[in-house]
Structure formats: C-alpha cells, structure tokens
A protein has these predicted regions:
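ATP-binding/phosphotransfer module of carbohydrate and carboxylate kinases, centering on a glycine-rich
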Residues: 3-6, 28-33, 78-185
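Phosphate-binding/catalytic loop of phosphoryl-transfer enzymes
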Residues: 1-91
Length: 185
C-alpha cells in the first residue's frame, strides 16, 4: 500500500510512484513520440508524445480488463469448454479437448480447477491455445476477438495520438504479430 511504501521509503525528499511501463517508456523516449504495447498475462499500452505527456491504455487487470491477454484467452477457453460440457458448443473442437486435458474431465475436478483459477493460472492456458496448429471455430473466434482489441489499441495510438513508433512486448505479442493488420505494424 502507499502508506507502507511511504513508511519504508521515507528517507527520500520526494517519492513518485509509477508503473513499470511508464518508467520503461520514459527511459526509452527521446524527443519523439513513442509507445509500448505489452501483451502477456494482461494487455497494457503506454505512450508518450514529444511533449512528454503520457497515457496508459488497458491494463485494468484480471478480471475486468486486459482483453486479448493470456488470462483472457484462458478464460475464453474455459467458457467454451463449459458450454461444450453443457451440450451447446462443439465438444469435438480441439480447444475443448486440450482444455479438458488440463482442467479435468469430471465435474468435481473441473469445479476444483476453476475455483482455484487466477490470472496466471488462466494465462498458462494461452500457451496451449497458441500451440494449436489445426485451427478450429473456437480458436478462430477467440483469436478474432483478441486481435480486434489489440488493433483498437494500436489504431487509437497511431491515428488519434499520432504515435509512430510502437514497441510490441510481452510473451504473447509474438503470436499476435502474424495476425495484426499490416497498417498497424
């Protein structure tokens, strides 16, 4: 908490608390506008214009934000799997099979897995998601929704805020790069 930090770091004349994304951006920024889009467990973008005015996009965290990030992909996989178990989703889909192999195939085991899930645990499912070579309807649906969110962030940074140099970071960005429209790269 802020009070704890102030107590432990009270020997500084002035204490400024900021995000790691902002600090990385400030360190990398010269006199030009620059941005960073980090796609990992979550999704967060930071940009700074040439006047050193900065803004953060997304990064609201689990379970409310970071659409397109690893935890969100994992959640979408779980939701699709639960619908398949209930009988109104394609239970033969490769995503369903792979998800069931991880979370279990019996109701009690599934309930136990999801009751203990948190952002990092869900994000681990995204590795399975991106390892699927034979694409499926569910895979394509989740991927399309994630790409849309990533592109909306990039579009805002490029078209609205005129940020011309954006670095893609994070463990999942390397998978999205092949799907993002060229005009945003």
């Amino acid at each position: 908490s802020r009070r704890y930090l102030n107590k432990k770091l009270n020997f500084f004349k002035k204490l400024i608390i900021s995000t790691d994304g902002y600090i990385a951006l400030a360190g990398a920024s010269t006199s030009k506008s620059i941005g960073v889009l980090n796609i990992g467990t979550g999704v967060v973008a930071h940009f700074m214009n040439k006047n050193k005015i900065s803004q953060q996009l997304s990064g609201w965290g689990f379970p409310y934000g970071d659409k397109g990030g690893g935890w969100w992909i994992g959640l979408k996989m779980i939701q699709a799997t639960l619908r398949a178990i209930d009988g109104y989703n394609n239970n033969g889909d490769i995503i369903i099979k792979k998800t069931l192999n991880i979370i279990g195939k019996k109701d009690l085991k599934i309930l136990n897995w999801i009751s203990k899930s948190e952002s990092r645990k869900l994000a681990k499912l995204s590795k399975v998601f991106f390892s699927v070579k034979s694409k499926s309807f569910i895979h394509n649906s989740i991927l399309k929704e994630g790409i849309y969110e990533i592109e909306m962030i990039l579009k805002y940074m490029i078209e609205e805020k005129k940020i011309r140099k954006i670095f893609l970071l994070g463990s999942i960005s390397k998978f999205y790069i092949n799907y993002i429209k060229k005009k945003y790269l």
